[in-house]
Structure formats: C-alpha cells, structure tokens
Curated annotation (Swiss-Prot):
The gene is sdnS. GO terms for molecular function: DNA binding; DNA-binding transcription factor activity, RNA polymerase II-specific; zinc ion binding. It comes from the Eukaryota. This is Transcription factor sdnS. It comes from Sordaria araneosa. GO terms for biological process: antibiotic biosynthetic process.
Amino acid sequence: MTEQAQREAELKRRKVRKGTHSCWECRRRKIRCQFGAGNDTVCLPCQARGSTCRSQEYVDKDARPSQQPDRRMAQRLGRLEELMARLVDRILPEAGGQLANRSTTQSNRGSRSPSPDSAQNEGLAFHQTLDVLEASLGPNTPAGLLLGLRDAAQPASMLTPESDHSPAPSKLTPSRNSKTSRSLYALFPPQEALPVLMKANAGPYYLTSLFSSFRDLIEGKVETANSVTVIPPAVSHPTVLARRLLQICICMQQLNPGYDTSPLQIKGTIPEYMNNVVTTVTNLVTSIDEIVSTGEGLESLVLLGLWHANAGNLRKAWLTYRRALSLGQLMGIDRGSTRALKFVDTNTDPQKHSTPAGLWYRINACDRASSLLLGLPAGDLDNSFATEEAMKRDTAMERLEKIHVVLTGRIIERNATRSSSEAYAVTQSIDSELERAATSMGADWWSEPDFDVTDETGHKLGEMLRQMLQMRHFDLLILLHLPYMLRDPSENRYDYSKTTCARSSREVLKRFIPFRSKVTAAWACRHVDYSALVASMTLLVGYLRQHQHATEPAPTCKERNEDRKLIEVVRERMQHVAITNRDKVTQESADILGQMMPILDLIDRSLMGDLSECNSHVLKCLHLKVPYLGTINFHPNVNVPEGQSANTPYSRRDNAGTIPGPVSVAGAATSGLEQLQPRMAGLSTAHDAAMPSVTAMSQGGDSMQVDMATFDPALLPPDTSIDGMYMDFDEQPQDGVHEIPDLMAGVEDWVLQGLDTTYWSLLNGNNMAWGG
C-alpha cells in the first residue's frame, strides 16, 4: 500500500467506544460478533453469510440511506392488505370501500363483472375464511389483538363493547342476510294498513309488555304499543323483521271472524297470509342458528311458539319453546349474563330492550305450560325469577303468575314421581301454596271480570288477563288433584281432591262462557279452550263415582241440572266458535262433550228408578276411546265376588286382547242405553278416528260402542292396581288407518295433539302416559 493510501485509510478511521468489537454487518443484524480464533480477520456470522466483515473503526462503505424492503415480504404484505380490504368490505361496506380504493388490485377486480358462478365460489371461499378467522380471533387471542378485528367488525353506530347490548357478529355474509331481509320485507302489509289492524284488538299492548314488567312499562322502559305499527327498514337484520312479522300475525289471530280484511291489503285470507309468514320466518330465520342467535331472534322464537299454541299446534309450540330455552342457556340469560345477549335493532332505544331476566321468565312460563298439557318434562326447573328479590317490583298479578309457573313445574315433577306416597305429599304441599297465593289476592280480585270487547285501551287487556289468570289457577287445581279424583270411595283422604276438582271445574266454566261470548276468535287465547274441555270432562267424569261410601254428600238433583246447563252452554259456545271460525279444536271439544253428556242421563234415570229389572241393568263398565291411546274401560265397584280382594283387578273378559291395569273406578246405574246408538250412528269413519267414544255395558252383556281409534299394546305399562279401583284396555290390531300420526303433525292431522292422552293418563294416576 502506498503512503498516500495509508494516510487516507488513517483519515477514515473512527473513534469507537472501548470494548466495541462487532463488525458493521453484525451490528445491523443485532447479533453477536464472534471469531473462531484470535488471529481471524472475518467473524463467524460474516463467514456464514459470505459478507464483508469490516470493523466499526472504519467507515461503512456499504451503508445505504434507507433499507429497501424484502421483495417477498412486500408481496406478503400486499396479499394481507388485499385480504383485509375484502374482509372489511364484507363487514363494513363503507369502510371496506375506502380501503379498497387504496388497493390497486382490489380496484382492478371491481372493474370486472363477475359471473354468478364466480361470485358464488368467492362467497363460499370467503365464508370458509370467516370460519377460520372467527375460530382464531377470540377476545384474547394474539391474532385478534394484533389485527384489531374485534372492534373493526362493529359498526360505529353501535354501543361500546362494555354495553350490555352490543351487536353480535354473524357468520353469514351480509349479502346473504340482505337477501333474507328482502324476502321478509316483501311479506309486510302496506304501512298504512298496520294502524288499522292494531286498532282492532288489544294485541299490541300484550306483545310490547310480554318480556317486561308493569313497572318497566310505567317507567318507560318498554316500547309503546304504537311501535308495533312501524315496519322496520328493509336493510334491518332478519330477526328484527321476523319479530315484527310475528307480532303482526299474533295480532291477526285476535281478529273476530267476519273482520273486513280489505283495508289490510294482504294476499289471500288471513289464515293463508299467516301460514305464509310463519313458514317463511321458520325457514329463513328461526331454523338458522347463525341468524337467530340475537336478542330479537330469541324473542322471535317465543312469539313463534305463541302463534303455534294459539293455532292449536301444541307440539310445534313446545319444540319452539324448547329451542328458545336452549338458545337462552347458550346466551347465559339463565345466569343473568348480558355479554352474549346481543340486540341488532339500531332503531330501538337500547334501554327498551328486553332484559335477560324477563326473557328467561317468559320462556320458562311458556315451556312449562305446554309441557304440562302434553305430559312432557319441563326444560328447566330454575325458579330464580320467583324469589322475593326478583318479585319485589312486581304487581300482585305478576307475582301470582310467577307462582303459577313455579307450581306448574312442581306438578310436572310430581307427575313423574313413581312413589304414590311421595306424590300425594307433594300434591298436598302444592295445594297449600295455591291456596296461600289465592288468599293473597283478596276476595274482590276473584270476582268474575267484565270488559268491553270494543275497548281500545289497556283496560280491556288487563281484565282479560285477570280472567285468564283466574282460569289458570283453577285449571292447575284440576290437574293437581285429577289423579285422585276417582280413587276408592272408601278412602276418605281423597274426598278433598274429588271436591276440589268439581268446584274448580265449575269456576273455569263460569268464566269461559262470558270470555268466549266476547272473544269469538278461535285463535285468540287458545288455552282457555283447553281449560274448558278439561273442566267439562272432569265435571262429567266426577258423576261416575259412587257416593254411598264417601263422606261428602252426593250432588243433588238441582246441582246436577245446574251442571248440565253449564256444560250445555259451554258446548254451545264451542260449537259457535267452531262454526264461525271453521276451527277443528273447538269442534272436537264440543263433540267430546256431546259424547259424554249421556253420563248425566244415565245417572238421572238410575236415581229416578226408571229401571226395569234393575239388577240386570246395573252399569257394569263405561268405555272411552281416546285417539292414539286406546279404549279405556271404567268398572264400578259393585258386587265384588266373595273371597275376591278389593285390590284384585277384575278377571279378563273373553276378549284376549283385554289388559288389566290400574284403575279409577266409576259407579252408577243406568237403563235406556238404546238411546245412545241413534245419536252416534251418523258419525263418519274419519270423524270417528279422531273422537273418543262412550260405551256402556250392562250385566246382561248388551253394549254399544263407536270405534274411534286403535291402541298399540306396546305402549301400555305393566299391570297394577290402585286403591281397589279398576280399569283395563281393549287391544285392537293396527290396520294402517288409525296409526299414530307424525310427532310434529299439525292440528289438521292431530286435533288435540295428545292433550286428551295426558288427561286420561292423569286420571288414571299417571300410569298410561307414553311419552306425550
């Protein structure tokens, strides 16, 4: 090296800190600079990379003003930016559009018109991408915190994440939701028709307070009744539109027959319109997990169940309530949690959204009511909504209603109890609680309500609710004591149950008559029809038991005549509703009562002595055929052969298909049975298949019977006996005509939906149930 070069090199030397030994390349990479031997001039990392190893004592000739990005890294970042632009564009169209404008690739793609196939494939691929992202972007996952997608996926107009009612993201793309929303929006009547509809009934007042308390209504925490008349925007979430459509349908159920539907401007009749709406909502909303999982979706499930219950589809209603209950548990509303309860209606004040407690109570109330009627277990037995703390703001009627829900659950549990002694103890306990609840209301509250059917205010609704709550109370008493009504007359402990059933039945019927005289729409408050049917059958069956061994006096002739008139008026009301509404439920109920009314005729004839050869015409048994259950044969405790135990069932008759079973025995004498046959001879085969029949058999062997259904012997429990009372079943072969219908059959195919099966099962001490 020349002297000039050495001088220049010396000039380029830099002063470095003492102890600095790393080269420039290791410093840039922030790695430790190590040498293999003391005399090495190139460090090990530079040897591995093949780079120049220059000490920091010398100026770095390779230093560049700015570090150029790695080409592969730039490509990866570009793809990530493109993916993020597509993602945000799907979730937030406005924000996504802005981001897309900054992406050349995205802009170029937008200039082309994709084919339907490519759009579908792109949507499928994006849906799969969302699945992966949703699985990896939990609240505390590194990817979620790094990308910040949790906050970006929420519209700015929504509440903060700390809010109890923040919106819930959906796995479905907004484009699919938009298509669903458009389909639902097309079902609405014209906006100007809704005020006319809502003015014709008190439904809006009931619907807006369904999930709230009266105190919330007073404090303005509930939507007004007028809100039901407002159609949500077409871009609303599908559950928002579905909820309003179901509210409209329930209001239509309250319309009296003959209502002029022309102002509503709907296609077809009201039943046709409602069925179309319910079918569409079921297919597009309530059956899609990703859509229905919102607060409005939970409300829609309850409303759908109410509609089915009023329409007579008890089983579909039960299944819908059970779905709502399961979804509510997933949301945590049974634990009071609001984190997963997301409301998506941005046009409603968040303070007026339903509370978890209100939703949980209403779901349980509906589920238990339908479960009791169908003989099924309750979905949940949590009673947190009925604690003193939970009811401190409730009115007296609200407290009574919640107590009824609690006791309904206890009756369901009692019915599943196999120990007779334990079941009877539970029955006495429930009866005491019902009596205590009734006393707390005061005597004036129990007077029969009177309301003006033309009243357009909330007063009409209040009186209707009071009347229905009274009927519900007496209905629970009937179903509570029904298993003990036909027990052995010599057992005095059952006399109270017999008397309670008869008294409660009369109270139900006395309220049913004025109610159905004013509210003549068959689909309005359907449960009052079921209550009237149960009460009427109970009052009639009560006359079958003997009174000579019982401590309570037998009904006098005057009482029998009053009961006869009461049931006849009830039957006339049912027939009127059936004819004016073309309703199968009330028609079937009226026909059942017509079949059972001869019981009173037989009692009158026997007590009046209008019997020839009385000893040979004493009533031996009464046969009732229940659809899809079989023939129930009631035997009176008469002329028990000497040496035969009172707890021994009657020997089987010549019919090999007769199966002895537990029994609540009836006792009465009769003659003039020939009058039954002309009354029944005109019934058609199709009608017979759905109607119970009454058959009386004398000791002489004469009998008259109308075949109504068949029975599968595999559904029967083992032979048992209860308190010396007897009942058996007649086995009939399945002929393919009267087979059990589909479990989810509607009211058109299965009118009473198994309600009659539950009734006779309870009357028999709950030994005949076959699963609902």
